[in-house]
Every structure is written in structure tokens, then in C-alpha cells.
Amino acid sequence: MPEGPEIRRAADNLEAAIKGKPLTDVWFAFPQLKTYQSQLIGQHVTHVETRGKALLTHFSNDLTLYSHNQLYGVWRVVDTSEEPQTTRVLRVKLQTADKTILLYSASDIEMLRPEQLTTHPFLQRVGPDVLDPNLTPEVVKERLLSPRFRNRQFAGLLLDQAFLAGLGNYLRVEILWQVGLTGNHKAKDLNAAQLDALAHALLEIPRFSYATRGQVDENKHHGALFRFKVFHRDGELCERCGGIIEKTTLSSRPFYWCPGCQH
């Protein structure tokens, strides 16, 4: 499943295609959304916001389209004259004079009014987004030490969107390798230096991935570009200590780590 950096890249692509352009055609597959089709004609997308793995497409009439791709949903950008060839099921079409964005296969789609943005179950539950430029290491440190999270092992905590939105499995293993910790550690057991390093890594690594990577299968090293240190590298040598990277399962997900320098 795509993680925060990939979701934000997708949002950037959608914005670049249709932001600020009048909508000439709008179509929704779900009957409960049909009434909004005519309300959106002539309106425009003001911005596309990410909340972890959910997208919020904001319109100029104050409506907001909530969508969560889950495992199978995918957005596509096409020329308006193009007829995409795909076996996927179309759920949403937002068309402008030159570009159209299409959402396929997703099932978690709703239209929200402004007051619903603060009461929607997922949006209420999700924590601060790691790609939010206003989120600071100090706030992350406070969350790590809060009664709600301080006793939880990082193996599960770093996958919990209620802690920080936008983290996922590859970010989990890369962050823990960066700070030399294991999935079994808990925030309450860290010293001040470890806690500070973790709080910074929880923001810096996702933001670096977003800025320089964007696709899960891009694992090339060009200068300072993001590359995996341990993810999918079991059996290889750790570049930090020379140990052998191992693979196990933690919180029902593959976990990659170096026993030589993560302890």
C-alpha cells in the first residue's frame, strides 16, 4: 500500500492537472453522490489535501470529496479527449476543458460539508500528518511520551495512523534503522538523545522520501536521493556496521533490520 510520500505525490499530480480550472463534467458511481454532480459543474478544485492515506479534494463551493484508496483504489490523470483502456471500475470523474482526473476501484468515498471535516470518523481518528510542514519534532516528542503512546512497541506504533498519519512499513523500518532502535523498543525506555533522534527521524525521513523519491519501486542511489538502507535488503551487508540485514515479521508485516547496530 502506498505510504504518505506516495499519497502526497498523487495529490500533487491531481492539483497540477485541474486545480483552479472550471469543472465541465462531474460523474460519481455511487448513488448517494449523484446529487452533487450538478452542484460541482462550473466550480473548481481549490486544493487537494492529504491526511495520511486519505485524500481531501476541496472545491470552491466549500464541498470536500473524501477518498481513501485502501488496497485497490488509484487516481489517474488523462487528457480530457482520452478514453482510458482499463479493466478497473470507475468511481469518480472530475473533468476540465483539457484534463480529467479519474478515481478507479476505491470504495471509501464521501462528500463532506465544512462542519463534517471535524466529525468524520477517520479524520477524527487520524493523527498529525508527517508531511505537514507545521508539525515539529517537539510535538512528535510530546506524542511519543504521552500516556496513550509511551508504552507501545514501535513495531505497532509506527503503523498506527492515530499516532502519526502517513507512516507505513517501509518508513517504519527505515526510521528505526536510522536511529538504531528495534521494533520492540518503547518511547518510555529511551534516553533523551534517542528520543530526540527518533522525533526528528519520524519527520525527516518521510519528507526526504517525498522530496526525492515518490515511487515505492524507485530504489536508485543518485547523490543524496532517498534510497532504502534495509527495506527489502535482507541478506545484504549493513552499510553502517557491516552486519547482515535480517527479515522477520512484526505486527503482521515484514520487518527488516540489522542486529549488529539496532539494539
Swiss-Prot record:
Cofactor note text: Binds 1 zinc ion per subunit.
InterPro entries: DNA_glyclase/AP_lyase_DNA-bd, DNA_glyclase_Znf_dom_DNA_BS, EcNei-like_N, Endonuclease-VIII, FPG_cat, MutM-like_N-ter, Ribosomal_uS13-like_H2TH, Znf_DNA_glyclase/AP_lyase
Zinc fingers classed as FPG-type: ranges: 229-263
Binding site for DNA: Q70, R125, N169
EC number: 3.2.2.-, 4.2.99.18
Residue numbers annotated as active site: P2 (schiff-base intermediate with dna), E3 (proton donor), K53 (proton donor), R253 (proton donor)
Listed cofactors: Zn(2+)
Presence of the UniProt keyword Metal-binding in the record: yes
Matching Pfam families: Fapy_DNA_glyco, H2TH, zf-FPG_IleRS
Keywords in alphabetical order: DNA damage, DNA repair, DNA-binding, Glycosidase, Hydrolase, Lyase, Metal-binding, Multifunctional enzyme, Zinc, Zinc-finger
GO BP, one annotated term: base-excision repair
One MF annotation (Gene Ontology) recorded for this entry: damaged DNA binding
Catalytic activity: 2'-deoxyribonucleotide-(2'-deoxyribose 5'-phosphate)-2'-deoxyribonucleotide-DNA = a 3'-end 2'-deoxyribonucleotide-(2,3-dehydro-2,3-deoxyribose 5'-phosphate)-DNA + a 5'-end 5'-phospho-2'-deoxyribonucleoside-DNA + H(+)
Family label: Belongs to the FPG family.
Function: Involved in base excision repair of DNA damaged by oxidation or by mutagenic agents. Acts as a DNA glycosylase that recognizes and removes damaged bases. Has a preference for oxidized pyrimidines, such as thymine glycol, 5,6-dihydrouracil and 5,6-dihydrothymine. Has AP (apurinic/apyrimidinic) lyase activity and introduces nicks in the DNA strand. Cleaves the DNA backbone by beta-delta elimination to generate a single-strand break at the site of the removed base with both 3'- and 5'-phosphates.
Name assigned to this protein: Endonuclease 8
Organism expressing this protein natively: Escherichia coli (strain 55989 / EAEC)
